[in-house]
């Protein structure tokens, strides 16, 4: 079976720092290692999508199966599920687009995780254009 590849282009944008909080929670760290095969850097790279084709490809991800990180109940909170898609960004992998079940982001903003601090590894700053290949 061949892997289908979707292309998404966008520009780097600043986040609120929430990705750093969630990616420091042991449940998510261990789950990403188990399901994606890597321990993510403690922070996400946020990308804003600005063209129609990339946005249509992003919307396909809502319907695609993806890799599901299950919801997890702890004594004083519930950690929501996350849908993930193995990806590369500007030809760097491993990486993954993550779509939390509970998010404040509009559909035009995606979050990327990787074992690397992607801003540094790719010399990125806000407004820089990136291309993501998503493997379905």
UniProtKB/Swiss-Prot annotation:
Binding locations of Mg(2+): 44, 46
Catalysed reactions listed for this entry = riboflavin + CTP = CDP + FMN + H(+)
**Key word Nucleotide-binding present in the record?**
yes
What pathway, per the record?
A: Cofactor biosynthesis; FMN biosynthesis; FMN from riboflavin (CTP route): step 1/1
Pfam hit, one = CTP-dep_RFKase
Residues that, per the record, bind CDP: 15-20, 116-119
One function term, GO molecular function aspect: riboflavin kinase activity
Whether Acyltransferase counts among this entry's keywords is no
Q: Which InterPro entries match?
A: RibK_CTP-dep, Riboflavin_kinase_archaeal, Riboflavin_kinase_CTP-dep, Riboflavin_kinase_dom_sf
Tell me which cofactor or cofactors this protein depends on: Mg(2+)
Q: Where FMN is bound, by residue?
A: 103, 111
What does the record give as the function of this protein? Answer: Catalyzes the CTP-dependent phosphorylation of riboflavin (vitamin B2) to form flavin mononucleotide (FMN).
User: By its UniProt entry, which PANTHER family does this protein fall under?
Assistant: RIBOFLAVIN KINASE
* HAMAP family attached to this UniProt entry: Riboflavin_kinase
Name of the protein described by the UniProt record: Riboflavin kinase
Q: Look up and give the organism this protein is from.
A: Sulfurisphaera tokodaii (strain DSM 16993 / JCM 10545 / NBRC 100140 / 7)
As recorded in Swiss-Prot or TrEMBL, the protein's gene is named ribK
């Amino acid at each position: 079976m061949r892997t289908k590849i979707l292309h998404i282009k966008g520009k780097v944008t600043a986040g609120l720092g929430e990705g750093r909080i969630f990616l420091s929670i042991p449940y998510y760290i261990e789950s990403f290692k188990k399901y994606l095969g890597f321990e993510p850097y403690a922070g996400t790279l946020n990308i804003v999508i600005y063209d129609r084709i990339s946005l249509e490809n992003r919307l396909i991800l809502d319907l695609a199966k993806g890799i599901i990180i299950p919801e997890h109940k702890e004594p004083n909170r519930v950690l929501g599920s996350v849908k993930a898609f193995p990806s590369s960004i500007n030809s760097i992998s491993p990486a993954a687009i993550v779509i939390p079940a509970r998010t404040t982001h509009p559909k035009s903003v995606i979050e990327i995780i990787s074992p690397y601090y992607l801003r540094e590894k790719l010399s990125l700053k806000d407004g820089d254009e990136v291309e993501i290949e998503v493997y379905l």
